Amino acid sequence: MIRSMISRLLPLLFAAAVFAEAPRPRPGFEGVGVRFTSASASGSGKAEDSATGFEVTGNFPLLKSGSWQYDWGFRYAQTRHDWTAAPVSFDLIRGASLNLSGYASTEAGRSRYAVLQVNGDAAEGVSLGDALTVQALYGADWRRSDTFTLGYLFLAETRAVRSPMVLVVPTFRWQFAPDWSLGTGRKSLVLERKLDEAWRASLTLAYQQEEARLADFAGQRQDYESERVAALFGLRRTADGRTDELTLGWAFRAQARREVGGVESEYDLAPGLLISLGSRWRF
């Protein structure tokens, strides 16, 4: 019965993975992390974007009220781009976020979480204050059995290039074998295997997105958005309050949008190799 349920819900489950950008708080969520990324283009004749960057994140306890634990958090990121045969030519994107999040768990196997996040992503020379977007997220999970958790996610957000979005979709995690699980992640669908008490391996179908306010073009506002669909292999080690993760993957579908003065244009990006290395320290 569970298998037939998942097959019917797969389109919506993928939508949950695609659009759930804000962090989903949970017990033990507090900590700081750093991640380095690299993306190289394949040289297939399409517009090419080779990029390197880093991201620093943190989540810190704020207060406890009843069954809810509230945190505040931040993100700061920089990505440097090297373009070939593309209609855009910016070099550096800076991004920052502030969020207020909360989570609550009950003895009945239900957990709830909520996030309000303000983002700003802009090219060098453009104020982050001119590139603000807002995202609100609320969700709940129910542990239906020892191996299956089902929930939903409500998301409302403003976006740099396209119109605001409101979405309600299901989420899940299914442990279909003692060391195997399948579930929705952050903009991803994740198949994970437990190797031992410290190590996990995963295969992920991921959606990656970048939005930014660019410098005005001929006196008109200019915005940029890119999207990638990628297959990723990851190794993660968690021990002594620290998590280290290495990810290798291939972006097999990539597209970008550029909006100037309200007029939008699209172009394809070349596929390419993705590498990510990160660590997170829990409090």
Predicted features along the sequence, with ranges:
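Short glycine/proline- and aromatic-enriched beta-strand/turn motifs that initiate or cap beta-hairpins
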Residues: 20-84
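Outer-envelope beta-barrel architecture signal
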Residues: 25-32, 66-72, 108-114, 144-150, ...
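Transmembrane beta-strands of outer-membrane beta-barrel pores
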Residues: 36-42, 74-82, 118-124, 154-160, ...
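Outer-membrane beta-barrel translocator domains and adjoining extracellular loop/strand segments
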Residues: 40-49, 81-89, 124-132, 161-169, ...
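Residues that define the transmembrane beta-barrel architecture of outer-membrane proteins
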Residues: 48-54, 90-98, 128-134, 164-168, ...
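Residue-level signature of outer-membrane beta-barrel architecture
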Residues: 58-62, 102-106, 140-142, 174, ...
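Outer membrane beta-barrel transmembrane domains
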Residues: 86-89, 190, 198-265
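Outer-membrane beta-barrel "beta-signal"
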Residues: 168-174, 179, 231-240, 268-283
